[in-house]
């Protein structure tokens, strides 16, 4: 199991079935997505937002939980309107119509979705009594116009909550499930996820822990090493929970775990939104580990192995040549050389012996009397 770090005999991940469907009391990704979608949609089906009107003032409210849409901005081009927010806790946006807007005036609301993506709802004032999509009618009074604006904003939010929001919820549920530890929704009263207000850490008792390999503080590459030459060691370990690999598994799992009922008229729009998000995730943000980074690390190790193999081959060839020179000596020729050397040595030793017997007295003449 090469993606298990140092635990080569241990599977790197839980089974596909367990990850997607769960097992026993352990929730799989499908359940985590379903619970997150309920929590983000909310009890009213408006993604945890609400719109109210008082006289000629329209107020857009966020419920203050970590679920659903988050109000992040508003841009107004409505004539005579005083627009403030988002401000307060929980955030609200207030639109006070001091006079009726002009035909064609617009107002835009910026929303952040659970997965961190953003959406803009743009509404345009129209003098027509039958406004089109993304429009609201200018009434006879500011109060009537405010009611029309409320209705148009409510419709736009509801449509977004039924189409794009479920896709964002699925993506964020994937982030929750594949985090360490996993994050799960705490249901509201009566086990109602639509009224949930918080997340908590999942455990092995209630959530499938998808990564089952070794997970120490040691860098992944250093979990497996090999000596390929004297003073040369390569690192080639890998873990399935590395950022790039996790991202790939997560996106694939989210697509596999997301299903749509035939009776859901918004299924196609939701699927398209999810597909766009998954496609965008194929290009991670700058500075984030990619599959190419891991490939580069392994390729560098492979290059080191290749170079070491060449060096080892050259060394083996040299040693083989030396061994062949030793093993390939002509024994007859060596014998003749040894005999010649022995004869020379014997002659030398004979001369040396004779020289050792010489004495000065042998060369002195007798002294006459």
Language model: regions and residue ranges:
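Amphipathic alpha-helical polymerization modules
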Residues: 1-17, 144, 158, 257-369
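Polar, low-complexity tracts enriched in small residues
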Residues: 119-149, 153, 160, 226-306
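Short acidic, Pro/Gly- and aromatic-enriched capping/linker segments at domain boundaries
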Residues: 207-228
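Extracellular structured ligand-interaction cores
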Residues: 104-106, 221-223, 233
């Amino acid at each position: 199991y090469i993606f298990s770090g140092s635990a080569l005999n241990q599977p790197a991940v839980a089974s596909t079935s367990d990850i997607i469907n769960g097992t026993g009391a352990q929730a799989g990704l499908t359940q985590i997505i379903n619970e997150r979608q309920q929590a983000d949609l909310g009890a009213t089906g408006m993604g945890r937002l609400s719109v109210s009107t008082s006289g000629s003032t329209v107020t857009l409210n966020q419920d203050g939980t970590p679920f659903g849409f988050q109000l992040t901005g508003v841009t107004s081009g409505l004539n005579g309107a005083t627009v403030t927010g988002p401000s307060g806790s929980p955030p609200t946006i207030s639109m006070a119509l001091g006079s009726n807007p002009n035909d064609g005036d617009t107002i835009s609301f910026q929303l952040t979705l659970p997965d961190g993506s953003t959406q803009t709802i743009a509404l345009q004032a129209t003098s027509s009594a039958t406004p089109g999509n993304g429009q609201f009618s200018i009434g006879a009074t500011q109060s009537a116009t405010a009611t029309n604006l409320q209705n148009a904003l409510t419709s736009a939010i509801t449509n977004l909550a039924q189409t794009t929001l479920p896709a964002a919820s699925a993506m964020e549920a994937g982030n929750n499930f594949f985090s360490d530890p996993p994050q799960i929704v705490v249901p509201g009263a009566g086990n109602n996820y639509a009224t949930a207000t918080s997340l908590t850490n999942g455990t092995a008792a209630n959530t499938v822990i998808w990564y089952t390999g070794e997970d120490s503080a040691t860098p992944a590459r250093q979990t497996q090493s090999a000596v390929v030459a004297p003073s040369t060691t390569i690192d080639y370990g890998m873990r399935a929970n590395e950022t790039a690999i996790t991202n790939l598994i997560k996106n694939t799992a989210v697509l596999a775990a997301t299903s749509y009922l035939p009776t859901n008229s918004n299924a196609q729009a939701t699927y398209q939104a999810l597909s766009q998000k998954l496609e965008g995730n194929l290009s991670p943000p700058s500075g984030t580990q990619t599959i190419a980074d891991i490939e580069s690390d392994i390729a560098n190790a492979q290059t080191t192995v290749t170079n070491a193999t060449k060096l080892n081959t050259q060394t083996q060839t040299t040693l083989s040549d030396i061994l062949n020179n030793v093993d390939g000596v002509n024994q007859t020729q060596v014998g003749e050389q040894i005999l010649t050397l022995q004869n020379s040595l014997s002659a030398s030793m004979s001369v040396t012996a004779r020289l050792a017997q010489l004495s000065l007295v042998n060369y002195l003449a007798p002294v006459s009397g």
